[in-house]
């Protein structure tokens, strides 16, 4: 595996606020728009919790600016870490699925009204927004076990009625892929009682936010889960799913695996370097199997030691 790359670092989140007063500085956005891919570090700090400008606002902004409509979160459980899962071994056997979350529509981007005695949040989706996220999910399923579970609240919400209608229409374009529907409350239960039944899960922004976080509980740690966010034609963004962990800042003990696996996703999805991605994933698995674990995994390795072990196993 041999290819050239160039890394350019830009301020974002809290660093962006400190540098320019905005979590997504203009020069950072300009660089992101011209990049081949974006690797995003974890953001957030207690110092901004009550501030009018917060690091998390930069996430919503960059998703909208780059039209990152599809968030992809793989969920798998490493054999060496099965003991960390809060579920019994038989419940997590065979768990390997992907959550596909619509990321730029829905209630998070609707109109928000707050008065002293009432509040209103508008949840709106167009057919085109639903259709493109469905096609993304079906395309992913076609390369896996050919099953899509579409999650909605069709028995109550108008947006979910449209969601289910478009799902059925898109399913006709992928005759080799099976489509099933689940209501979100039922899906939340099944994700704990029988998570191995899922292959590709697709849902709207709010439901996806909740269910993807629920799925992250299955491996027993946030430290080994990567994610990607894709646009239709621009650069994709890759990031670990965990936060910035300010309580251990500067101690050098953070688990680097989520970021390393995010790099593997970047190699595969943005650069077409499938062999390189698989090498990284195999190296991570081998390292864990060897019993080299960071503190959040019950071991003693620090960040640099874990990273060095993974590199050695490449």
Task: Enumerate the language-model features and the residues they cover.
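Glycine-rich phosphate/diphosphate-binding loop of Rossmann-like nucleotide-binding domains
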Residues: 1, 116-185, 197
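N-terminal beta-loop-helix "entrance" segment that forms/cooperates
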Residues: 2-26, 191
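Flexible, glycine/charged-enriched surface loops at secondary-structure junctions
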Residues: 2-6, 144-152, 174-182, 272-281, ...
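N-terminal glycine-rich phosphate/adenylate-binding segment common to multiple enzyme folds
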Residues: 18-123, 206
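Short, glycine-/small-residue-rich phosphate/pyrophosphate-handling segment
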Residues: 77-108, 124, 128, 243-277
